[in-house]
Amino acid sequence: MSKVRIAISVGDLNGVGIEIAIKAHEEVSKLCAPLYCINSYMLNQASTLLNYKIPSNFEISEVGGEFAVKKGCVDKDSGRYSYDSFIHAISLCEQKKADAVVTMPIHKEAWMLAGLKYKGHTDLLREHFKRDAIMMLGCQKMFVALFSEHIPLKDVASSIKYKKLKQFFLDFNNSVPNERVAVLGLNPHAGDNGVLGNEELIITKAIKSANKKVCFEQFIGPLVPDIAFTPHIREKFKYFIAMYHDQGLAPLKALYFDESINVSLNLPIIRTSVDHGTAFDIAYEKKAKTLSYINAIKSAIALGERL
């Protein structure tokens, strides 16, 4: 049986992504057939800076473009190349030349400097596929999906609309159909029956309606946010839905930073990613850890087996 073929988007080459890819290649090659979206010029430049030998079976799919790597720097050229690598990886999946995409970290400011309008991978995937992709992060011990992602905190409350939230729950069910899911409230004490805010009324209505639609009590809540990730609750739930970015990711990363990954749900392709940034502060210093990347590879393979 042939190995799963995974297109690797190399991320921002001024960061740690390419170090992780080369360092983990031997182990990853035992799990799948990785195809790295980079050209030989950029790969050789990065490997020289790292003083790493490129493995003989390090297969690349050429992505055009040449620039000087500026390790640890925010740069429009590296931003543009990380975008081009990602688009190339998506195209390989669409052409059935790859079974999944795994992404290394990009830098959002570098994308902005390159004139790109997207706030990140998930934002691009939504527009590319015209689907409401869901960002979910975590590991086998706990996963957290985000209702709102990269928006200012002041805009979160106004983003909580009944129809939008209900559809989010139903889209989540399409990807994770059989698991019970803990849904967090927005306000302290989950609003204290309206004393500290009314958004929980909207969340409750959306939960009830979605559960009726999926024909079982899949979504439970809204839970009081400050106790949602306590050991007692985590014994009952593996999946959580947070109303905003830091509400869900601060506890996740405090508990499982090194091993967590990022998964895009509700899409026609499989896409997983490392759950960390470009780590410019340690770029090309041979200090980057590979566990999140290896877990992202394993999850992409597992998701493919489920389809």
Swiss-Prot record:
Gene3D superfamilies: Isopropylmalate Dehydrogenase. Its cofactor is Zn(2+); Mg(2+); Co(2+). Substrate binds at residues 121-122, 253, 262, 271. Keywords: Cobalt, Cytoplasm, Magnesium, Metal-binding, NAD, NADP, Oxidoreductase, Pyridoxine biosynthesis, Zinc. Pfam families: PdxA. GO terms for biological process: pyridoxal phosphate biosynthetic process; pyridoxine biosynthetic process. InterPro entries: PdxA_epsilonprot, PdxA_fam. Pathway: Cofactor biosynthesis; pyridoxine 5'-phosphate biosynthesis; pyridoxine 5'-phosphate from D-erythrose 4-phosphate: step 4/5. Its EC number is 1.1.1.262. It is found in: Cytoplasm. It is an enzyme of class 1 (oxidoreductase). SUPFAM superfamilies: Isocitrate/Isopropylmalate dehydrogenase-like. GO terms for cellular component: cytoplasm. GO terms for molecular function: 4-hydroxythreonine-4-phosphate dehydrogenase activity; cobalt ion binding; magnesium ion binding; NAD binding; zinc ion binding. A divalent metal cation binds at residues 150, 189, 245. It catalyses: 4-(phosphooxy)-L-threonine + NAD(+) = 3-amino-2-oxopropyl phosphate + CO2 + NADH. HAMAP family: PdxA_Epsilonprot. Catalyzes the NAD(P)-dependent oxidation of 4-(phosphooxy)-L-threonine (HTP) into 2-amino-3-oxo-4-(phosphooxy)butyric acid which spontaneously decarboxylates to form 3-amino-2-oxopropyl phosphate (AHAP). The active site is located at the dimer interface. Homodimer. Belongs to the PdxA family. This is 4-hydroxythreonine-4-phosphate dehydrogenase.
